[in-house]
Amino acid sequence: PDVDRTDPLIKSWNDLKKIQQPDFTSHGRFPMVVEMNTLYRESVDEDPTLNFCAPFSMAANIRGMESLVMDIMTKPAFARELFDRLTDEVIIPWILYLREKFPNARSICGSDAMASLPIVNIPILQEWIIPYVLRLREICGPGVYVPNWVGESCLQIPEEFLELKLRVCPDFLEGQDPDVAKIGPAVYKAYAEKNRVALVLGIGAGFLALSHPAQVAERVKQYIEIGGENGRFCLYLCNIGVTTPLENVRAAVAAVRKYGVYTVG
């Protein structure tokens, strides 16, 4: 389920009072998330990767993207109060609650797709987005990270955006189509090796759904051969849709099995 974008939850200063710490044991879908994570732990005997919605994307959902950007430009005090309340009253307590329930979880991953180019620009990222993720890391621990910003292919110098990505996800660099297809996997590999971090590349969902199996296999091969050089590489398939031909998924998996083996020696 998604929010009703025609009727945002936050319309005025008075609405900010609605943002209070929930009862995670009973309110909304919080108990369901805990139950699903518990079932995962019982099934595989290991704590799951914990997930949360990052401050900017949450603010955009409950305020509306256009309104939020206008707030940043014309009503910064209102925008700051919105971000502060969401971060301090909802997101931080939720992460700490999850950590208490799943103390052996090694990763706490924030989803923040709306904090991507060209939806936002570099100054907004630097002033309004990164500081709140860093606050989460400071209070909730270094296991917190936000990996899924996209849009570096919009820039003449993609590395300017990759640098910002590593500030909120310092252990690995993630890129996905269509960015990787546009600027090439070698750009990501070079930047990851320069900064001594692992690399994660994603094959786009649209590409998987609309391409022929041979094209899928070729892209998987290319990303593995370039991204996997010297190791420290992971490939994933982005949000496979129900319309994706089964033969394309099989082609991707077969290509991974064929090319995704590190040479030992």
Where are these regions (language model features)?
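Active-site loop segments of alpha/beta catalytic cores
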Residues: 2, 22-265
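A contiguous, low-structure linker/loop signature
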Residues: 1-22
